[in-house]
Amino acid sequence: MSLEETLRSLSLDYLNLLINGQAFSDVTFQVEGRLVHAHRCILAARSLFFRKFFCGPDPPSGLDPIGGGSSRQPTVRPGVIPVNSVGYEVFLLLLQFLYSGQVSIVPQKHEPRPNCGERGCWHTHCTSAVDLALDTLAAARYFGVEQLALLTQKQLVSMVEKASIDDVMKVLIASRKQEMPQLWTTCSHLVAKSGLPPEILAKHLSIDVVAKIEELRLKSSLARRSLMPLHHHHHHHHHHDFGDLEDQKIRRMRRALDSSDVELVKLMVMGEGLNLDEALALHYAVENCSREVVKALLELGAADVNYPAGPAGKTSLHVAAEMVSPEMVAVLLDHHADPTVRTVDGVTPLDILRTLTSDFLFKGAVPGLNHIEPNKLRLCLELVQSAALVLSREENNASNNNNNNNNASSSAAPVYPPMSEDHSSSSSGNNNNNNNSIGNLNLDSRLVYLNLGATQMGGDDDNRHNNSHREAMNRQGGHGCDPSMYHHSHDF
């Protein structure tokens, strides 16, 4: 037997002591109401924290050396030590490493996790995997297990390469707090490359961290320019000035949107050449402004309602779905937002709402979104589902029309004799009228489907559409919803 096999066998023997529970156990912890049996000698040998806790005159905080909690909470089982500093899952990972020297920080594949709504996720770099690694890192530092902290840091470095920018910023904050220079360097460069403006970064990071990110960007820009030929320096100097000017435009645009001054934004587009898509004007307005501002911005005709933003490639409809805002969802769909558009990870707005609904139904509340109103969530889901259904029907109709046209063009010579000029023109006029009426009917059906505040239209067909849609909304949401509700101003 080789040395490696001997060490592996020794590691498994110690791990079996932990797995077998009470076998030879001389200490019991209580974590989140669950008992964990362990062995003092192993814990004291592997962790300075437990050595001081079991043997030192002044035990560290985080565990109750008496057992059973405070005097106001009488001890039910003497000798049980409550753990109040970490969760059950993280505490088991910590003990697993102390016993065996090995641990897998990645959650089980396809296991339902609280912060991961994707079905069948492998949890390699999702938010749930990142959160578990961060909690393990904090526990390793707290209990003085430096080897586990280094192992977790290495795991996080590989995770953040594929993680979302939100999770990268989360790890960046933790790396600074835990004094992990390698992790800080990796995350800070990823955030600097993300292209997010300082105003957005300031919402997630402290001012001094944002300043360091901007310093990294400046150094990177200077380094790139130093590699350019000398005759290009003058050009890049103007390019840098142009970038500063664009940043100023974006700040002015956001101030104008905050004050509902869409006319100023229009002047900036026409007079200064402001690109609303690159400035993420629509995303900003959906997240921070009222429905009226978003509608006025869309009616300028200068913004692409399906423009993907950031590394994740989210459209404004993705943002509205995450906000669970029926008003924003409605006005975006009214201006032809695509309910089936996908992010880089393949997530559609419909997927977001279905995940939120599933979490709400099975867990009673959505983590981080406890303010969600069930009726708003149902209404958003109904709107996006209806829009996706209408879009699918329109695509099928268009496909059928193309097939019919191809079949007609490839057929033999006409069987019937040519009609007179008057009859032909009359028939042509009737066909045009029929086509127009069909187009209007499709448009009316779309408006009724999306419940976007269309005015009451004459005719029995339209009444039947409106009545059937209200009945569907009553069945789905439990309450009838007047389309006029979307014309109210809602500030965010």
UniProtKB/Swiss-Prot annotation:
Q: Where is the composition biased (Basic and acidic residues)?
A: 461-473
Q: How does it sit in the membrane?
A: Peripheral membrane protein
| UniProt cross-references to Pfam families, sorted A to Z | Ank_2, BTB, DUF3420
Q: What is its main location?
A: nucleus
Induction remark:
Induced in roots during early nodule formation.
GO molecular-function term, one example from the UniProt record: zinc ion binding
What the record says about disrupting the gene is:
No visible phenotype under normal growth conditions. The double mutants noot1 and noot2 exhibit complete loss of nodule identity and develop only non-fixing root-like structures that are no longer able to host symbiotic rhizobia.
One GO biological process this protein is involved in is: regulation of DNA-templated transcription
Relate the assembly described in the record.
Homodimer.
Q: Give the family, as the similarity comment puts it.
A: Belongs to the plant 'ANKYRIN-BTB/POZ' family. 'NOOT-BOP-COCH-like' (NBCL) subfamily.
The UniProt function text for this chain reads: May act as a substrate-specific adapter of an E3 ubiquitin-protein ligase complex (CUL3-RBX1-BTB) which mediates the ubiquitination and subsequent proteasomal degradation of target proteins. Transcriptional co-regulator involved in the promotion of leaf and floral meristem fate and determinacy. Required for the abscission of senescent organs, probably by regulating the cell wall disorganization in abscission zones (AZs, e.g. pulvini at the base of leaves).
Q: What is this protein called?
A: BTB/POZ domain and ankyrin repeat-containing protein NOOT2
Q: Which organism is it from?
A: Medicago truncatula (Barrel medic)
Q: What lineage does the source organism belong to?
A: Eukaryota, Viridiplantae, Streptophyta, Embryophyta, Tracheophyta
Q: Which gene holds the coding sequence for this protein?
A: NOOT2
